[in-house]
């Protein structure tokens, strides 16, 4: 406790400055959401051996000589504690990440022969909604508990700098997953190559509309690095490769920063642009939102390119509501996050940036063995 107190005193001025810079995200004390209880994740009941084997075959996560879908050779002390904080509990993407993380912890315990109190433990939690203050409150709880490693998918890394610095000061290994911290203070990042994946989505949409017409981008969140990177990659494809074509971005909507309802956003978009040619979505929630809206229309005259995968999204591809979707590999991402954290705790070699897989899915390749192997996690 003395060490923590000293740290808070040392960072007092820094925290005040950061609070000022991030004042948009700060609410008065009486308005803050109550601190959430953090519960330890239960052990995995389904070992999912088949899922992991197909992951390794079709979507390996390797960098250099290290296989991040393997726990072989990792040495951890009995009772090692790992915590993971996602952005929100409403997005099914994080359930898939959690499944992969649980499997990795199960494999570590099996490999090391740990049982009972000696088992490596995983706690996985997130605020109910994507809210900066709520996520910081959860991170603060974990800092009090001082796990061996803390893995975070940042909602707004700039608002979490004090927590990042505190973790490092107290020897907690800090791993970013899905979304990096903007100052690269974490030990490593495990996630999709968002710029590359989003650029591929833009290429698919532009091809579908014949390289002409009005296009809108529905971005999940301006504050997250994933939102910024995916949006910018889409814009850059047009600027760098098709600036001589008649393609025009007519609107870029940041869903998390909107006060309007989802229906109002899309109603107004089509009212202003009745000749809209296409919509590009940047995550699971924005994709499902546009799917739901499109299904209510009497006639849909625009193409939709999605991002992420779920049962609803796959069905929309089958029904030709979507031209396709860019599926990430959340199961593999979760597994690799744990092996990366374990390597950091053990002081073993690891890369600073580890890319999990992404795969464009459309009606033509949906039933292939490769794509189906990636979609197995949807039933988990």
Kindly give the residue locations of the regions a language model identified.
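Hydrophobic alpha-helical segments within soluble ligand-binding/sensing domains
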Residues: 61-72, 135, 190-215, 229, ...
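Signal peptide-proximal N-terminal region
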Residues: 102-122, 239-246
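Extracytoplasmic "Venus flytrap"
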Residues: 59-77, 81-108, 123-136, 154-157, ...
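Hinge/cleft segment of the Venus flytrap/periplasmic-binding protein
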Residues: 32-34, 40-78, 225-226, 237-241, ...
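C-terminal motif of bacterial Sec signal peptides marking the signal peptidase cleavage site
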Residues: 17-20
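Bacterial signal peptide processing site
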Residues: 22-24
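Flexible loop/hinge segments that line or gate small-molecule binding clefts
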Residues: 149, 157-196, 214, 310-318, ...
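Hydrophobic alpha-helical
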Residues: 140-145, 149-168, 234, 254-315
């Amino acid at each position: 406790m003395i060490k923590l107190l000293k740290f808070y005193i040392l960072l007092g001025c820094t925290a005040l400055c950061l609070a000022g810079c991030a004042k948009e995200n700060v609410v008065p004390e009486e308005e803050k959401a109550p601190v959430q209880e953090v519960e330890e994740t239960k052990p995995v009941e389904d070992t999912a051996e088949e899922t992991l084997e197909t992951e390794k075959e079709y979507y390996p996560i390797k960098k250099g000589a290290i296989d991040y879908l393997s726990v072989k050779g990792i040495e951890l002390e009995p009772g090692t504690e790992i915590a993971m904080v996602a952005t929100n509990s409403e997005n099914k993407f994080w359930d898939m990440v959690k499944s992969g993380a649980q499997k990795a912890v199960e494999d570590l315990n099996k490999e090391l022969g740990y049982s009972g109190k000696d088992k490596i433990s995983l706690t996985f939690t997130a605020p109910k909604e994507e809210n900066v203050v709520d996520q910081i409150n959860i991170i603060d709880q974990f800092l009090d508990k001082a796990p061996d490693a803390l893995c975070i998918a940042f909602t707004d890394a700039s608002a979490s700098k004090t927590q990042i610095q505190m973790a490092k000061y107290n020897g907690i290994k800090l791993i970013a997953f899905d979304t990096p911290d903007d100052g690269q203070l974490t030990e490593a990042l495990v996630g999709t190559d968002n710029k590359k994946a989003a650029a591929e989505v833009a290429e698919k949409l532009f091809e579908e509309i014949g390289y002409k017409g009005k296009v809108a981008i529905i971005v999940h969140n301006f504050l997250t690095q994933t939102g910024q990177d995916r949006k910018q990659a889409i814009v850059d494809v047009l600027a760098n490769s098709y600036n001589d074509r008649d393609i025009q971005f007519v609107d870029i909507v940041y869903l998390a920063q909107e006060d309007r309802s989802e229906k109002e956003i899309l109603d107004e978009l089509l009212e202003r642009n009745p000749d809209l040619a296409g919509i590009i979505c940047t995550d699971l929630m924005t994709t499902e939102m546009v799917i739901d809206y499109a299904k209510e229309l009497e006639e849909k005259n625009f193409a939709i390119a999605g991002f992420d995968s779920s049962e609803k999204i796959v069905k929309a591809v089958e029904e030709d509501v979507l031209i396709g979707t860019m599926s990430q590999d959340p199961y593999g991402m979760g597994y690799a996050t744990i092996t990366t954290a374990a390597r950091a705790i053990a002081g073993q070699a690891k890369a600073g940036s580890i890319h999990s897989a992404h795969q464009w899915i459309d009606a033509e390749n949906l039933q292939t063995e490769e794509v189906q192997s990636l979609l197995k996690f949807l039933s988990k």
